[in-house]
Amino acid sequence: SLDMAYNGFFGHQSPDGRHHDARVAAFDRRALVKYSAENVAMVEAVRGRWNQRDAVARLHGNLMDSPGHRANILNPDITDVAMGVVRTKSGVWVTQVFVDLTGALTAPLPVRMRPGQRLDMTPALRGWHFQNFGAKQAGNRYVALGRAIPAGLHGDIELTANGRMRGEQPGLYYTIRLPGPAVTVGR
């Protein structure tokens, strides 16, 4: 909401090209998210004024009258919700972020890391057995990390926790790659 209000846009993609999943990865330093969705709504002030009661009703209507937004609000698989509200002279912006939080790191991940730095943690995954960490790079390229940031890796990455679950039949397994926090790897 703050990004939209002060950077003059309204939508799910910010001017720098980021979507809600990138914002979740930037701000929550422990979350491992299986699914996420975002709702945005806005009410503009008319001639510099707005009616608070009317604005709340209009924002609520904007969200509940949209089939996609309503589906996000009523989704039974959502485990956590975050909401941001910003009021300025020009209007009110509301952002709702919905996640299926499937796991968490045991400690917050640093914002900046360096090659060789250890990843001495085993995340708790709901329903999955942790296998290893990975790094999602630009262009959806993935690199296995093991227990440390490898030499040669640099720039912005998104940590992933890779898990495995036994299937219904012997020898059948499911795998998952859960997006985690964003990290800048420096040299």
PLM region descriptions:
Residues 1-8, 124:
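A short alpha-helix/helix-coil micro-patch that ends at or immediately precedes a cysteine
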Residues 14-100, 130-167:
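A well-ordered secondary-structure block
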Residues 104-187:
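Beta-strand-enriched, solvent-exposed domains that form extended recognition/catalytic surfaces
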